[in-house]
Amino acid sequence: MKKVLFILAIIIVIVGIFLVLRPRVSASKGATDGGKILVAYFSATGNTKAVAEKLADATGADLFEITPEQLYTDEDLNWQNDQSRSSIEMASRYSRPAIASKIENIAQYNVVFVGFPIWWGREPSIIDTFMESYDFAGKIIVPFATSGTSGIGDSGANMQSLVPNAHVRGGERFPVDVSVSELKTWASEQM
C-alpha cells in the first residue's frame, strides 16, 4: 500500500511540475511568443471594415486595409450580372486582382486575422492575392467574414491551401453589429 501511495505522490508531483512549467499563450501579450497581431481586411461596402475595426480594438492589433489597385464600383459588385467584374473574378479560382496596399514588415506578426465579405460562398479572389503575397509560414491565420446570410464556407480550407506552412483556423462569419466583447472572446479562443 505504501508503494502505491508513493508512486501516486510521484505522479502528482510530476504532473504539477508539468503544469507549472509548460509554455503558455497569452492573448494579453498581443500574440504568441511576444509577437504582434494584425487585422487585415478587404471591405467593398464598409461592413467588413466596421467589424475589422472592432476586432482590432478588441485585440490591440494593428489594422491594415487590403485595397485593390482598381477600386470596385457598384456595377463591379453586381452579383446578379454575370459580366460584372466580381462575377468574372469569382468564376475562376485563378483570378488574382492586384492589391495597391502593402504590409512593410509581415515578420513582426505572429497572428493575422484576415477579414472579407463572402462572395459566391467563399473569400473574394483579392484575398487569395493577399495570401500569396506574403510569407505566412508558422503564423496563425484566422479568417473572419461578413455576410447577411451566407456562412464562411470553405474559405479557411481555401486559404490553408494557399499557405500550407501557416496554421489557418476555420474562421467565423459575423454580423456588422457584433460587439467588441463578443469579438474579444472569439479572438482569444483563436490564438
Q: What are these regions, as identified by a protein language model?
A:
Residues K3-I7, G16-M191:
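Active-site-proximal alpha-helix that buttresses catalytic centers in soluble enzyme cores
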